[in-house]
């Protein structure tokens, strides 16, 4: 199973329990050539027919330009801080989370090197 970036999903679920060290996955992502040469890198930690949990690492200043999604989205900042814009603009820091409904225009900018978990329903 591959994620939307064409990469192999790390932990496709098949019924049952799975545990993942997010800290270890952040270290792994930051040790790749994609991280060294780019501004962000991501991998699906869990992906099945109903759910996608994406871990993304972003360098300071990295942006996800304004876009919309087909399903609600929750963004949990694991480390660092981001500027999240969806009508209003908020700084979301490590340990904080923001959620939006489907089809809401939004954008993200890393205020510092950051890691975020994006949780979306598959529709």
Where are these regions (language model features)?
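Glycine- and acidic-residue-biased ligand/ion/polar-headgroup-sensing regions
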Residues: 60, 70-87
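Conserved short histidine dyad/triad with adjacent acidic residue
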Residues: 35-41, 49-68, 102, 123
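Structural motif
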Residues: 81, 105, 114-115
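A short hydrophobic beta-strand segment most commonly corresponding to one strand
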Residues: 74, 112-123
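A cytosolic small-molecule/anion-sensing beta-strand core signal
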Residues: 78-79, 93-94, 112
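A short, N-terminal "cap"/entry segment at the start of jelly-roll beta-barrel domains
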Residues: 1-50, 85
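Short acidic-glycine-tyrosine-enriched beta hairpin
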Residues: 87-103
């Amino acid at each position: 199973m591959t994620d939307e970036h064409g990469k192999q999903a790390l932990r496709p679920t098949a019924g049952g329990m799975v545990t993942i060290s997010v800290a270890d996955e952040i270290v792994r992502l930051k040790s790749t050539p994609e991280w060294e040469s780019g501004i962000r890198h991501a991998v699906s930690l869990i992906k099945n027919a109903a759910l996608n949990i994406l871990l993304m690492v972003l360098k300071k200043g990295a942006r996800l330009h304004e876009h919309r999604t087909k399903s609600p989205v929750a963004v949990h900042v694991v480390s660092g801080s981001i500027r999240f814009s969806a009508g209003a603009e908020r700084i979301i820091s490590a340990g904080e989370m923001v959620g939006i409904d489907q089809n809401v225009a939004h954008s993200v900018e890393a205020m510092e090197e950051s890691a975020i978990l994006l949780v979306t329903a598959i529709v």
